[in-house]
Amino acid sequence: MMCILSEDTIPRTQIEKRKTSLYFSSKYNKEVLSPPRRKAFKKWTPPRSPFNLVQETLFHDPWKLLIATIFLNRTSGKMAIPVLWEFLEKYPSAEVARAADWRDVSELLKPLGLYDLRAKTIIKFSDEYLTKQWRYPIELHGIGKYGNDSYRIFCINEWKQVHPEDHKLNKYHDWLWENHEKLSLS
């Protein structure tokens, strides 16, 4: 025999409990918003090169480094880097970026082209960066080989295992191989 329950037959406390999703509870938000603990927190300072790549400055904050790779995708550094610094001033963390209105982010990105797509990508990426269990950033929305290689080279000291395809990353990677003994890199 099947029993159909209506709101009248369910105790009021059960109905009230359902109205509050875990998503909105402060306990859930605190846990979700803390950055994932990963290899990125091992001590590794990539050496400064003659190429002065933006990754050499942002290695200490993987989210910012990965945001830079989104900015640099199909855009010259000369155009992207000034807008990147402006973006990071307004949106200094994944928590702030994931809560942003994509239209505001899009307006900031207009000089770079693909601004609506990039804005939505940045917001979704920032959310996944905080909430998804990931090992490498290529698992996150908007991050491809370039972003993944940058993370592995500059954030977690896996430069020996990486074979970059980007010309600037290749220059840095080749420079590391040429100088790793002199720089005492393992």
Where are these predicted regions, by residue range?
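Catalytic cores of DNA base-excision repair glycosylases
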Residues: 49-186
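Intrinsically disordered, low-complexity, charged terminal extensions of DNA damage-control enzymes
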Residues: 1-59, 171-186
